[in-house]
């Protein structure tokens, strides 16, 4: 209790404008306890690793704090200190602990500013409760993208250089000691092989990535978007509500105005060349979409400015293939696990005036979303549910489990896929994925009982695993009474759910990797 009160005292320092408080928190045990409690709901390494009990975990934290303090103190005087001996030895357990603890520390000033900002936005946040679902993005696409023509499909570039991250963090935190410590940690990270998550997990957003890297990446993306929104507002002379999130930036507008001046001087282009009020920007994780109604000249201008922004301000080389200019009614956009594009539907109307009859073709614009079958089969192949050709195979790792457990696991995967891809315009691809999982479930049970598929299905009957194909209809029947929707048209149509807050695990993420400076 005393430690939590002490923690509250440290948080109150922000109100008195004392910013030099982050560094001492590194040597407080309760910081690592908070990191441990936060990690219980994540796939991070807990403090009790390798058979440690709570008592030995506390001793491990004390030992880590002692070694950290001694090593930092000695590194001030020793010029040729070995970075691999920062905590005594290369130990992934200790490195994960210090990573999680430091991530809690650097998040404190951001959390305080965010809470203060949201206190004045409670009414607006209550109105936008449904928009917390990532499925709410697609109704936004349907309402706003159907009358647009061109889309910039952007993958935010990487790698992130350590010094760029320190510079970004300096805009937010005025604690010099913490900045030096952050720089020290970053260079240590790039020298410690044990601190970098194995390359088998390529996505920065995977649950196996340390919280520290997620925080640094989000800080980098937010810095990029802050400048991007500033350029967007300057070009259209409109103020975006997103600019309200710029808390206490150090001479932010002056810095960005200098950046704009550099753009004008170095590239001999003016911002008025891409002025247009109809422009929409959407981002999820490392993928963003920029849509406009104008001709390709505008999109080429934005591509040109984004590439130069990344190269000259963030010192990141953007590969040409990371930005694509797509025609909304000719090319597909891969976003949030869906293939989306505009579609023109022709409606023929027969009209008659006096004795003359004629047909009128009316073109109606719609936004179409479909399930990408090839990436999903690739994910199922990686998860060992099928081979590279899409042929179902058994799941040998579940062979020791009970029949009910195996069926429940497969049913849960099918249920989540149906729930996530319920907004697909065409269900045929989704039915194929369900078929793969259904046969994989049968083969897993057959492998366990050392039988054949024919004998196994004959013994259980034809109703076995029918719920693989009827689960979505069952859920919709609970939401919409059949008396209101007597036909099956509802089940074939698109349904967006507002309770989905994260992307499905089987949807491929964009690859992300951090390289040393």
Swiss-Prot record:
InterPro entries: Domain_X (IPR024937), Maturase_MatK (IPR002866), Maturase_MatK_N (IPR024942)
PANTHER family the UniProt entry points to: MATURASE K
MF annotations from Gene Ontology: RNA binding
GO cellular component: chloroplast
Entry keywords, A to Z: Chloroplast, mRNA processing, Plastid, RNA-binding, tRNA processing
Primary localization: plastid
Species: Acer pseudoplatanus
Coiled coil: none
Protein's UniProt name: Maturase K
Family classification: Belongs to the intron maturase 2 family. MatK subfamily.
Membrane-crossing residue ranges in chain numbering: none
Biological role stated in the UniProt entry: Usually encoded in the trnK tRNA gene intron. Probably assists in splicing its own and other chloroplast group II introns.
């Amino acid at each position: 209790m005393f430690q939590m009160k002490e923690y509250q005292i440290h948080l109150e320092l922000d109100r008195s404008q004392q910013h030099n408080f982050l560094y001492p928190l590194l040597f407080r045990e309760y910081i690592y306890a908070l990191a441990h409690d936060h990690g219980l709901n994540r796939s991070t390494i807990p403090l009790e690793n390798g058979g440690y009990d709570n008592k030995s975990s506390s001793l491990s934290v004390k030992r880590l704090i002692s070694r950290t303090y001694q090593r930092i103190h000695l590194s001030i005087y020793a010029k040729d200190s070995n970075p691999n001996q920062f905590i005594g030895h290369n130990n992934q357990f200790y490195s994960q602990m210090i990573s999680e603890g430091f991530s809690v520390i650097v998040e404190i000033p951001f959390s305080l500013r965010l809470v203060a900002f949201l206190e004045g936005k409670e009414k607006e946040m209550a109105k936008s409760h449904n928009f917390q679902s990532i499925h709410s993005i697609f109704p936004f696409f349907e309402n706003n993208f159907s009358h647009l023509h061109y889309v910039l499909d952007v993958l935010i570039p990487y790698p992130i250089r350590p010094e760029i991250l320190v510079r970004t963090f300096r805009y937010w935190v005025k604690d010099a000691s913490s900045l030096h410590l952050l720089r020290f940690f970053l260079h240590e990270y790039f020298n410690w092989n044990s601190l970098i998550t194995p390359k088998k997990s390529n996505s920065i957003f995977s649950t196996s990535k340390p919280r520290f890297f997620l925080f640094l990446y989000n800080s980098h993306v937010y810095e990029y978007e802050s400048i991007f929104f500033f350029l967007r507002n300057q070009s259209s002379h409109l103020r975006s509500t997103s600019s309200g999130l710029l808390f206490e930036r150090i001479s932010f507008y002056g810095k960005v105005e200098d950046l704009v001046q550099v753009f004008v001087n170095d590239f001999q282009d003016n911002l008025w060349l891409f002025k247009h009020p109809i422009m929409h920007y959407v981002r999820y994780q490392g993928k963003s979409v920029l849509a406009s109604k104008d001709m390709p000249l505008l999109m080429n201008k934005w591509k040109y400015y984004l590439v130069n922004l990344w190269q000259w301000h963030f010192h990141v080389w953007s590969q040409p293939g990371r930005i694509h200019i797509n025609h909304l009614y000719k090319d597909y956009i891969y976003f949030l696990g869906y293939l989306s594009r505009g579609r023109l539907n022709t409606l023929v109307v027969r009209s008659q005036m006096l004795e003359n009859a004629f047909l009128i073709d009316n073109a109606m614009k719609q936004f179409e979303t479909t399930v990408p079958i090839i990436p999903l089969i690739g994910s199922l192949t990686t998860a060992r549910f099928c081979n590279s050709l899409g042929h179902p195979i058994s799941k040998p790792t579940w062979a020791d489990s009970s029949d009910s457990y195996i069926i429940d696991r497969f049913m849960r995967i099918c249920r989540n896929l149906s729930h996530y891809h319920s907004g697909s315009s065409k269900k045929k691809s989704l039915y194929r994925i369900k078929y793969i999982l259904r046969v994989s479930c049968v083969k897993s049970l057959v492998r366990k009982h050392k039988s054949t598929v024919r004998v196994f299905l004959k013994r259980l009957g034809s109703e076995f695993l029918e719920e693989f194909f009827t689960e979505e209809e069952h859920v919709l029947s609970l939401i919409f009474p059949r008396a209101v929707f007597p036909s099956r048209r509802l089940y074939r149509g698109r349904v967006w759910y507002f309770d989905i807050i994260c992307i499905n695990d089987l949807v491929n993420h964009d690859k992300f990797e951090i390289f040393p400076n």
